[in-house]
């Protein structure tokens, strides 16, 4: 039995409703993973070219500082030079040549192939991310996040049909040792879901241990390289325009070992990037193009995600404002720049500044998700569960945001216009021969599931019925859903034999009994 599936009800109307809520083939669903965006274009063609040219100038005239010794070797071997200021300069011709040979149309694999992603063109996928240091409960109380929280988040993501991949969302603050934190972050993530996983590491040795574990789960190193189901989120730059030493060392190993990398530049407009939105975008495009050259110098054609995460400051305080309209515009524009290069693009959306799942949270997430998704951004990170400008994570918001993402996906699909959908004959029949309404028409019943999207948590009942059922708000309904999933859904895709072997060789800190139903 699928623990994620809604429980069937036995009485007539509820049984019919449950049947309608059953899974449809992807081709018939009103929404599905990888829907085609691209209708919203915040930048004109001239704007895109201007940003591209500015990025090339920044790389060739300003360059990046603080390259590692091995990074210098890789970059100078393909044509980079060193300026009088000791910065790595990237000739325009080198950047253009790299763009011509960079990896395109590469899948992001999952442990279960049905969750494989095809993030190219203008296909849209929403997923989690972040390094929140707190959990927020249904009452709004904050506490430090731990390893069990990370595992529980992944278990819920595993059941959320509109959350298409799971990138590490919280920091296990109960693990002070950096090696144990990195290893267990990866272990808990891949154990909690069969969807594609993203994680990060602070030292190459930590990554080596995780790779050994991933080889065991895959069956062998060769099988891992055929279908790498974990990608590395790598903040290889410290904006503005500097390399990050530890991250670059991990980047080199990941590329060599066949792990896809998210080249993540997260400059904050008004703080670590220009306050002018166009300038912030140009800087981040330049930084990610530098990362692309770096990756291809290590291994030509290695899979790399163009990760322009343009963050925004509230200029009154200097603090990050992840739920702002400027954030929506920058992330949408970042997706548009990735289309210009025909690269798999990753950007961020859903980073509300609200501390709890309130009206502010819904408004900020809704406008950001709708704009960024309709811009056709391929991989939309931070999309579910986040609060307080990435400082907090809520399980209740995770399931609420699954609904918000679903609504955004429905706007991406748009309105299908053809002879049948224009409905001339249906209108004529109802007006001339029928009852004067469409409630029971064949077309209405046929399109009920394929044309219309219904919320999982959103309430559409009349006020009297809502009151009779306890007047629950969406947070209360989400809390019930979360507790039900946590009590019933324990993924078992990694065999007990493989798990025991992993535990025999590595310091797994997640108790096995916490990974089984009580």
How would you label these PLM feature ranges?
Residues 65, 69-141:
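Glycine-rich, N-terminal phosphate-binding loop and its surrounding beta-alpha-beta segment
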Residues 27-31, 47-49, 54-56, 118-139, ...:
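N-terminal small/glycine-rich loop or linker at the start of catalytic domains
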Residues 141-378:
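Helix-rich catalytic cores of soluble enzyme domains
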Residues 2-30, 42-53, 62, 67-73, ...:
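Catalytic-core signal marking the mid-to-C-terminal active-site face
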Residues 36-40, 317-322, 350-357, 386-397:
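Short beta-alpha connecting loops at secondary-structure transitions
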Residues 47, 59-66, 79-82, 99-106, ...:
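Structural signal for hydrophobic packing residues in well-ordered secondary-structure cores
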Residues 370-392:
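Glycine-rich phosphate-binding active-site loops on the catalytic face of alpha/beta enzymes
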């Amino acid at each position: 039995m699928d623990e994620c599936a809604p429980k069937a009800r036995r009485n007539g109307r509820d049984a019919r409703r449950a049947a309608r809520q059953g899974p449809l083939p992807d081709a018939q669903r009103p929404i599905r993973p990888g829907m085609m965006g691209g209708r919203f274009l915040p930048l004109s063609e001239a704007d895109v070219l201007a940003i591209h040219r500015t990025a090339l100038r920044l790389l060739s005239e300003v360059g990046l500082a603080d390259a590692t010794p091995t990074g210098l070797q890789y970059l100078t071997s393909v044509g980079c030079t060193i300026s009088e200021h000791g910065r790595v300069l990237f000739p325009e011709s080198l950047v253009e040549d790299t763009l011509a040979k960079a990896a395109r149309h590469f899948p992001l694999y999952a442990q279960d192939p049905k969750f494989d992603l095809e993030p190219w063109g203008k296909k849209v996928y929403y997923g989690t991310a972040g390094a929140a240091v707190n959990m927020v409960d249904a009452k709004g109380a904050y506490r430090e996040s731990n390893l069990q929280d990370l595992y529980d988040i992944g278990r819920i993501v595993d059941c959320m049909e509109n959350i298409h991949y799971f990138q590490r969302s919280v920091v296990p603050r109960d693990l002070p040792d950096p090696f144990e934190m990195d290893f267990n972050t990866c272990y808990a993530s891949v154990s909690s879901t069969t969807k594609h996983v993203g994680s990060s590491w602070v030292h190459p040795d930590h990554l080596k241990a995780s790779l050994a574990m991933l080889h065991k789960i895959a069956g062998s190193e060769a099988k891992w390289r055929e279908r790498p189901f974990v990608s590395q989120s790598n903040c290889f730059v410290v904006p503005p325009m500097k390399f990050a030493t530890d991250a670059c060392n991990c980047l080199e190993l990941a590329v060599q070992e066949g792990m896809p990398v998210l080249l993540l530049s997260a400059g904050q407009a008004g703080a670590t990037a220009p306050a002018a939105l166009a300038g912030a975008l140009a800087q981040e495009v330049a930084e990610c193009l530098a990362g692309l050259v770096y990756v291809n110098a290590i291994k030509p054609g290695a899979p790399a995600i163009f990760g322009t995460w343009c963050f925004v400051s509230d200029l009154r305080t200097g603090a990050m404002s992840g739920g702002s309209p400027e954030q929506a515009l920058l992330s949408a524009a970042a997706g548009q720049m990735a289309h210009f290069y025909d690269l798999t693009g990753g950007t961020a959306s859903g980073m509300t500044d609200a501390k709890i799942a309130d009206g502010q949270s819904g408004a900020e997430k809704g406008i950001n998700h709708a704009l960024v998704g309709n811009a056709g951004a391929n991989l939309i990170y931070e999309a579910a569960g986040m609060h307080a400008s990435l400082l907090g994570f809520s399980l209740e918001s995770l399931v609420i945001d699954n609904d918000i993402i679903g609504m955004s996906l429905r706007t991406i699909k748009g309105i299908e216009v053809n002879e049948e959908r224009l409905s001339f004959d249906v209108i004529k029949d109802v007006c001339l021969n029928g009852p004067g309404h469409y409630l029971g028409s064949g077309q209405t019943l046929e399109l009920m599931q394929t044309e219309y999207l219904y919320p999982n948590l959103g309430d559409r009942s009349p006020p009297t019925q809502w009151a009779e059922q306890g007047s629950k708000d969406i947070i209360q309904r989400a809390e019930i859903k979360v507790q039900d999933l946590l009590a019933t859904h324990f993924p078992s895709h990694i065999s007990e034999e493989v798990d025991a072997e992993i535990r025999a060789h590595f310091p797994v800190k997640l108790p096995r009994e916490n990974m089984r139903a009580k």
